Amino acid sequence: MGYEILGLPMAYYIAMVLKVLVVFVFVLLTVAYSTYAERKIIGHMQVRLGPMRTGWHGLLQPIADGVKLFFKEEIIPSKADKFAFLIAPLIALVPAFIGFAVIPFGETIEVGGYKIPLQIAAYYDTASGQVVDLNVGVLYILALASIGVYGIVLAGWSSNSKYSLLGGLRSSAQMISYELAAGLAIISVFMLSESLSLQKIVADQANGAWYAFKQPLAFILFFICSIAEINRTPFDLPEAETELVSGFCTEYSSMKYAMFFMAEYANMVTVCAVTTTLFLGGWHGPGFLPGWFWFVAKVYFLIFTCMWIRATYPRYRYDQLMRLGWKVFLPLTLINIVVTGIIVSL
Amino acid sequence: MLGAYLPILVLVAIAVIFGLCSLVFSSLIGQKKPSVVKLAPYECGCEPVGSARERFSVKFYIIAMLFILFDIEAVFLYPWSVLFKRLGMFGVMEMGVFIVILFVGYIYVWKKGALEWE
Amino acid sequence: METFFFMIVAAVAVLASILVITCKNPINSALSLILTFFCLATLYVTLDAPFMAAIQVLVYAGAIMVLIVFVIMLLNVRTESGRRSSHSVLFGSLIGLFTLFQLFYLFNRSSLTGQKGTIDSALINKVGHTELIGKALYTDFLLPFEVTSILLLVAIIGAVVLTKKKI
């Protein structure tokens, strides 16, 4: 253990690479299988069976889909802006997959005398005896969410198709509106936790009640705004196929289309993980099972809720959507902040 | 400091490599039989009419501009929310003034109908 | 190691900002500008200012650039064709050289380096950058903070006046 690179022990680097790989594979598998789960769950809710042919009860469906998309023809429209058209899926995908870096997904484990916090962007500082993570963890996630907009706006613009342009514009206006409301909704959480570090937010909930109980309004607002921000039903206006064909990804095919698809589901996983961490006590749960189990269970429950909502509600109309974001959610979040401020300081 | 940020760099690298690999391999593996019609923008199977590079509603700009302004408000709220218990009633008052002034702007925007989509 | 990392990020930042002014396609210029903001954010992180880094991405790359991209799309700016007029090249380089000269002059005089601040990395790591910024903003700089809200109010009214035909 004596060997050090840049002031950090070798064990740190091994643990880091392992954590990164485990989380990346976890997100990738969850993304792949939530597409399957979504088809299956909605199928059963609508008294259908969903995919049944590939593998036992269609279990190999995501793999078959992936392979199929790999072999599809790649079409780049002749009028498209090539560079922007190629880079747009990448800009959508990368922020969606790296959001997980700041989310704590389990308690600190000890391997061979070296303490490893189960959070990618964190390490155990032996000098202070504390887990050090990003001081601005929540802002990191918000910043990434604000970058995801470019993938969609560029895809819409560069395709040089009317449907794409309208879909891209609509969806970017929707995303920024709800990003704002989501960003304001979680401020009342920081007012209770007195920190933007996700480790501290989770620890604070373990000592008291979950923030979902202390801040029920913020919880509901944040979850709805997040669903709207990642363009899921009932707010999937950019993909309103009855009016916009397929929105911003009308002209996309093969793996580039799949990348938007993966980005959408990865965003859903990230949003559910953030909601778990901020409002549902993170990885804390009854002690008989390890922390990561509770974390995964809560995240999967929220993912299930997203699918349930999709099966239940019809799509919003665009003017209703914008009215909801700007005229209902925005003032509600501000009122929630002021009320929390007055109650706490009295 | 390094210990907390280095993993993010590694994760970014992995995500970028994953994305690039998907792009490159799918374009290598997939068949390519381009034709003029196939590469034309999709318009329900008809000949595309006019250009897609047209001006669009000014609504989107006002949303983008208002987003910047209220986002800055949110940015001011983050450090305040972390500190507000330590600032006490004084902190609530000063942020109250800030929010009320911006709320006046919000009401102005509402009354002028800038948030209407018809 | 830290210097080496700084060199790489700074080189990318400079390259990206050169691309901003040389790209023929305005959207590519905007993308380069976003990359420049990212490099700046990375530099803020290496300077122990994570809050600044997050705000840099959140406000500049995530909000202001969205508006700029929208405007590029609205104005339907075509790819710039042909050469720029020789006048603008001449004046541009003259102004650039003058600014460079000014910078060198200032650095040589080093009249800018005043006292060192009291906040160092150790304090930031202990208290937290967000907390330190908040403490300064909401106690020492209270008036500028409240004035900011009036500035934002003016900007909100300006945005409405600019975009509405009938007020």
Swiss-Prot record, chain B:
Among InterPro entries, the record links this protein to: NAD(P)H_OxRDtase_bac/plastid, NADH_UbQ/plastoQ_OxRdtase_su3, NDAH_ubi_oxred_su3_sf
Q: What's a single GO MF annotation on this record?
A: NADH:ubiquinone reductase (non-electrogenic) activity
Give the membrane topology: Multi-pass membrane protein
Q: Where does the UniProt annotation locate this protein?
A: Cell inner membrane
Question: Has the keyword S-adenosyl-L-methionine been applied to this entry?
Answer: no
Reported EC number(s) for this entry are 7.1.1.-
Q: Which terms are listed as keywords in the entry?
A: Cell inner membrane, Cell membrane, Membrane, NAD, Quinone, Translocase, Transmembrane, Transmembrane helix, Transport, Ubiquinone
Membrane spanning segments where? 5-25, 60-80, 87-107
Coiled coil location:
none
Per its UniProt record, what Pfam families does this chain match?
Oxidored_q4
Q: Does the keyword Transport apply?
A: yes
The reactions it catalyses are: a quinone + NADH + 5 H(+)(in) = a quinol + NAD(+) + 4 H(+)(out)
Going by the entry's taxonomy, the superkingdom of the source organism is recorded as Bacteria
* Primary location: membrane
Query: Can you supply one Gene Ontology CC term for this chain's record?
Result: NADH dehydrogenase complex
Give the similarity note.
Belongs to the complex I subunit 3 family.
Q: How does it assemble?
A: NDH-1 is composed of 14 different subunits. Subunits NuoA, H, J, K, L, M, N constitute the membrane sector of the complex.
Protein role? NDH-1 shuttles electrons from NADH, via FMN and iron-sulfur (Fe-S) centers, to quinones in the respiratory chain. The immediate electron acceptor for the enzyme in this species is believed to be ubiquinone. Couples the redox reaction to proton translocation (for every two electrons transferred, four hydrogen ions are translocated across the cytoplasmic membrane), and thus conserves the redox energy in a proton gradient.
Q: Which named protein is this?
A: NADH-quinone oxidoreductase subunit A 2
UniProt organism field: Geobacter metallireducens (strain ATCC 53774 / DSM 7210 / GS-15)
Q: What is the lineage of its organism?
A: Bacteria, Pseudomonadati, Thermodesulfobacteriota, Desulfuromonadia, Geobacterales
